[in-house]
A protein has these predicted regions:
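C-terminal, low-complexity intrinsically disordered regions in eukaryotic proteins
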Residues: 100, 104-113, 374, 467-468, ...
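Proline-centered turn/helix-capping motifs that create local helix->coil transitions or kinks
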Residues: 186-191, 229-234, 301-304, 337-349, ...
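C-terminal transcriptional activation/regulatory domains of eukaryotic transcription factors
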Residues: 152-265, 271-282, 309-317, 361-368, ...
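Long, amphipathic alpha-helical regulatory blocks in the mid-to-C-terminal portion
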Residues: 7, 240-268, 292-308, 328, ...
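Extended catalytic-interface subdomain
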Residues: 368, 375-391
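Acidic/serine-rich, low-complexity amphipathic helices located in mid- to C-terminal regulatory regions
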Residues: 84, 134, 177-180, 275-353, ...
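Short amphipathic alpha-helical segments embedded in low-complexity Lys/Glu-rich regions
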Residues: 32-35, 51, 196, 267, ...
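Intrinsic, low-complexity transcriptional activation domains
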Residues: 1-186, 200-222, 236-237
Length: 582
């Protein structure tokens, strides 16, 4: 219905007035009086839209809107206890210095750009302007769509029939490097490593049958193992072997799914496949595999590790690894829900799992960056859980109120990185691949989550129960700008430590880092004087140039690389216009 004729003092309501609705006549929905009530001098009453209360438990009932204060405080207290143990033990740790929380978090960050969000009001949140020649977000989103399409073609029916030729000696090296240099995968410790060590020697032998679930895990390990710096292969060779490993994984998945019964091995295979698929930009497969993993968690009663029901097959004193694995599954569930707009899975049902290392019979708290990264990532996940609980709370009805609470949560997440000095640690990291990857995961997950939490703000005015969401909807905010800036800095640092094209594509796939690149580029393109963003311009150019160099020969990701180049060219053109010639 046309809204022409509506005066400046009138506004369009989304509901029909009660009188028109009772008489079953069309209402033009103009407030404060509709077109039918006004000429008859009748009282015009509009119904008040009540925010729908979710019928499902949001997370564990402990994290629901009604009980969030006490329960979250309890969990945070437990995290602080673990952090205190970590700080107490870190003083005796040798080697590279391990960061410790700064207490009040007041220490000034020494990263390239300090936090610039203090003192900004919620009114600073503004939508993107659409009156510019180039929208970097649109350009990069289209490029990512092209990458997804090219990769689907690459692994289509033709590729499925091609052979997988991985030399046995290299396969053994990559398996060994994976277990030595990659962070401990969720629940992988429950699988007998000797099985994986034997696979390279027997996989091509006649009359030898390897279970499909073991093949899925084996090829996933090969995928990660051949990309490690310790494997000492060139970027081009690594790309070919990674593609072969992914192909082997895809081939084994259908047979495995037909045989899967919900064992721990099935759970490990599903989590591995979900991770690898996300790095290959196949988010549909990643999401499907993760849903299966959550089903297996429930089949194994991992969501009841600390409930009163003693029907799990884990001993009470020995399930810290399972607790940690389950918490990592929760973190993935929240992250997928945020960036892929998926419904909650494992967090949709009741679960009761304590943090690891709190039981009196537990082993001593491990020291080092692995533990610190887990504690930091757990706090990040709690912030995201509180964010979703806040969105579903019917008491939060106004957009300014929700925006203000979201900004507070994002600043709290920033404080986590400041306290643990994770960016500073990454800047000084050298060759410890295990620690580097777990710290990078926390940094990339946390700052990406900040950006996507603000993306949700653009949907608050929508009346659709499932509004369409895109990466183009991220409003302007100094908090988001800071998060994007730090993400670009982390990417540049990681590509220095691991100068491989597969590193770049895996990070852009798993963490959708193109959103940070596009947001920062749009900020520069909209600025009146881009010269005030010279440090950011150089950081974007550095990332684009390094990606171009590393991805030579990788046809699938060229649309993404060329899109970054074109955006930087546009920034340079604007910069030249603003620079006086003398």
């Amino acid at each position: 219905m046309s809204s022409s004729g509506v005066t400046g003092s009138e506004q369009l309501n989304r509901l029909s007035c009660k009188r028109c609705k009772e008489r079953k006549v069309r209402c033009n929905r103009v407030m404060p009086q509709c077109g039918r009530c006004k000429p008859n001098d009748l009282e015009c009453v509009y119904p008040v839209r009540v925010k729908r209360r979710s019928a499902r438990p949001l997370i564990d009932p402990a994290l629901s809107a009604d009980g969030s204060n006490a329960a979250l405080s309890t969990i945070l207290d437990r995290l602080q206890r673990l952090e205190a143990q970590t700080v107490a033990g870190s003083s005796s740790t040798n080697g590279q210095s391990i960061p410790t929380p700064s207490g009040d978090g007041s220490e000034v960050s020494s990263s390239p750009v300090a936090f610039s969000t203090t003192g900004h009001e919620s009114s600073a949140l503004t939508p993107h302007s659409s009156d510019r020649a180039m929208d970097a977000m649109t350009v990069l989103k289209d490029a990512v769509d092209q990458v997804q399409e090219l990769r689907k073609r690459s692994f289509g029916s033709t590729a499925i029939t091609s052979s997988i030729d991985i030399p046995t000696d290299l396969a053994k090296t990559w398996v060994a490097n994976y277990f030595q240099h990659m962070p401990a995968c969720m629940f992988l410790g429950l699988l007998d490593r000797r099985i994986i060590d034997l696979i390279p020697d027997i996989i091509n032998l006649p009359h030898i049958h390897v279970d499909p679930v073991i093949l899925v895990i084996y090829y996933s390990i090969m995928y990660h193992g051949c990309s490690l710096k310790a494997s000492n292969v060139t970027s081009t060779s690594s790309l070919g072997y990674m593609n072969s490993s992914y192909l082997g994984c895809l081939r084994a998945v259908p047979s495995w799914e037909r045989e899967a019964s919900g064992t721990m091995t099935d759970l490990i295979a599903a989590l591995f496949t979900s991770r690898v698929a996300a790095e290959f930009f196949d988010y549909d497969l990643a999401w499907r595999m993760f849903k299966q993993a959550c089903e297996y968690c429930q089949t194994l009663n991992l969501h009841k590790l600390d409930s009163d029901e003693n029907n799990t097959f884990f001993s009470e004193a020995k399930c810290d690894n399972e607790r940690r694995g389950f918490w990592e599954v929760i973190q993935i569930d929240l992250f997928y829900r945020l960036i892929l707009n998926t419904p909650p899975v494992i967090t949709n049902d009741i679960w009761k799992v304590n943090l690891p290392w709190l039981d009196p019979d537990s082993d001593p708290l491990p020291q080092g960056m692995q533990t610190i990264a887990f504690l930091a990532s757990s706090r990040v996940s709690l912030v995201i859980a509180r964010f979703f609980a806040m969105l579903d709370d019917p008491e939060n009805t106004t957009k300014p109120e929700i925006v203000a609470k979201t900004e507070d949560l994002c600043r709290e997440m920033q404080q986590i990185f400041t306290e643990w000095q994770l960016m500073e640690w990454l800047e000084g990291a050298q060759d410890n691949e295990q620690d580097i990857w777990v710290v990078a995961d926390v940094i990339l997950t946390g700052y990406t989550s900040i950006i996507y939490m603000f993306r949700k703000m653009a949907l608050l005015n929508s009346t659709s129960p499932r509004p369409p969401t895109t990466d183009l909807d991220i409003p302007d905010s100094p908090i988001v700008e800071d998060a994007a800036r730090r993400l670009i800095a982390a990417l540049n640092r990681l590509l220095v430590i691991y100068p491989y094209g597969v590193t770049m594509t895996a990070l852009f796939g798993a963490y959708r880092c193109f959103v940070a690149f596009a947001y920062l580029a749009n900020t520069i393109l909209r600025a009146e004087d881009p010269r005030s963003y010279m440090a950011d311009i150089k950081a974007l150019e550095r990332l684009s140039d390094q990606s171009t160099l590393l991805c030579r020969g990788n046809r699938d990701v060229m649309p993404l690389v060329k899109a970054m180049q074109s955006i930087n060219e546009e920034i340079r053109k604007k910069l030249e216009k603003q620079t006086p010639r003398g």
